[in-house]
Amino acid sequence: MLSAVLLLAAAPARAGTAGGSSPALARLKADLAGPESATQVLTRWCGELHLAEPGRIRAVRVHQDKPAAHWIRQMLHARPRERLRYRRVQLMCGAHILSEADNWYRPARLTAAMNRILDTTDRSFGAVVRPLNFHRRTLSRQSDTDAMTPLRLTAVLETPDGEPFSLVVENYRPILVMPPRHSH
């Protein structure tokens, strides 16, 4: 599975598809490859696309559990008996879902306060762990995975010393690359 994920990182967008040839999709990919967190990028896009006033992102938790596959545990360097937590959120701008994310993380690498916030609130993971001064390492980038997902990113979040603490699979929605037309 790990080799399949890494091969997908090099897979080009399908030529001729709306998402694959979209300048907006190319810009979204470039922005998400930059130093900002996904939440910061989506906050900026929310405002630029005028999807809501104010252009703010909120995370809505989807309460469910999903065990980490073996390859996820490997990518996170999790010890054999180490417990991982799972969190699924929808990042929304007003009434619009911009992305849905599956996140497996190592609670032992976070502070007690961070774990409490993640367990009891809808705050985005990136906002909560920002004090760790983490960086993202993209493992794969897939375009046009299905009609509702013009872009899927798989990334690992790492501390400045290179220790992985989170693996996230982000599914970005069409509204980002084909926003609704507003009449003026």
Where are the regions a protein language model picked out?
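Long terminal accessory segments
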Residues: P150-E158
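N-terminal domain-onset segments
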Residues: R14-M92, H96-T145, G162-V168, Y172-H184
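Well-ordered beta-strand positions
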Residues: M1, Q90-M92, E158
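Bacterial N-terminal signal peptides
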Residues: M1-A9
